[in-house]
């Protein structure tokens, strides 16, 4: 049986004194405070950048909403104008039908050029309305009115400490809290503007479908009138 000598027995581990333990705890607390302060500064910088980004989002959303509202008005005008054009073409078609009994009259040779001009002019009018009126929205006045939505958006959290739990209770945390409140209000404004844009798009979708149908009807009527004119001129 093996025997251990006294020399082979390890020395007992010396436990730190109470003073040493307190110093180590204090050192760790100091390091933790420094880490918290560092993270707070980083969070503050991030919140400032978020405010800038959300402000730009609001500006873009306001401009887009204003453009959609202006586009909605122009779509109404285009739809009304197309309906009037089709009504006028139907009248022309009816009159040509009534004149078919006078085939061979020189009057129809005079009619040919104005009718071609009328068809070309009608397409130009629609093209000008789409290109000019839709690309020049009245943004400034609508932007100013819509910006009030951003400044007066619902303040869901107004009391201190609702967004973050205070650790240092210093000026950095105060500013960070204010920034978070501003971010919350900005996001609320963006959400409201997004809803407005969605509503506008939903309202305009059936109008675009009706305009497409009116355009097809217009082409059909013009083709029919052209056929009648060709028969009369030959």
Swiss-Prot record:
Key words, A-Z: Cell membrane, Coiled coil, Membrane, Repeat
Record function comment: t-SNARE protein which regulates the secretion of aex-5 from intestinal cells. Involved in the defecation motor program, which is a coordinated series of three muscle contractions that occurs every 45 seconds.
Name of the molecule in the record: t-SNARE protein aex-4
Subcellular location: Cell membrane
Entry-linked SMART domains: t_SNARE
Domain called t-SNARE coiled-coil homology: residue spans: 37-99, 170-232
A cellular-component GO term for this protein: presynapse
Annotated family: Belongs to the SNAP-25 family.
Free-text disruption phenotype from the record: RNAi-mediated knockdown results in defecation abnormalities.
Chief site of localization: membrane
Gene Ontology molecular-function annotations: SNAP receptor activity; syntaxin binding
Cited PROSITE patterns: T_SNARE
Coiled coil: none
Expression by tissue: Expressed in intestinal cells.
GO BP annotations listed: exocytosis; positive regulation of defecation; positive regulation of protein secretion; regulation of defecation; synaptic vesicle fusion to presynaptic active zone membrane; synaptic vesicle priming
InterPro entries listed in its UniProt record: T_SNARE_dom
TM ranges: none
């Amino acid at each position: 049986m093996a025997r251990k000598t006294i020399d082979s027995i390890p020395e007992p581990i010396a436990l730190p004194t109470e003073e040493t333990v307190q110093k180590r705890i204090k050192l760790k607390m100091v390091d933790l405070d420094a880490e918290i302060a560092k993270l707070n500064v980083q969070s503050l910088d991030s919140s400032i950048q978020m405010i800038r980004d959300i402000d730009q989002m609001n500006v873009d959303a306001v401009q887009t909403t204003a453009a959609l509202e202006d586009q909605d008005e122009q779509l109404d005008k285009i739809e009304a104008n197309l309906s009037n054009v089709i009504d006028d073409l139907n009248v022309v078609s009816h009159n040509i039908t009534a004149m078919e009994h006078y085939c061979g009259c020189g009057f129809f040779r005079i009619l040919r050029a104005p009718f071609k001009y009328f068809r070309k002019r009608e397409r130009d009018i629609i093209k000008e309305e789409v290109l000019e009126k839709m690309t020049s929205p009245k943004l400034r006045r609508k932007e100013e009115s819509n910006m009030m939505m951003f400044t007066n958006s619902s303040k869901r959290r107004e009391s201190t400490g609702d967004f973050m739990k205070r650790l240092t209770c210093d000026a950095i945390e105060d500013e960070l809290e204010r920034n978070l409140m501003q971010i919350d209000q900005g996001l609320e404004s963006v959400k409201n503007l997004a809803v407005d844009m969605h509503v506008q798009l939903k309202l305009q979708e059936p109008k675009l479908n009706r305009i497409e149908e009116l355009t097809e009807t217009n082409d059909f009527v013009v083709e029919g009138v052209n056929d009648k004119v060709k028969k009369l001129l030959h």
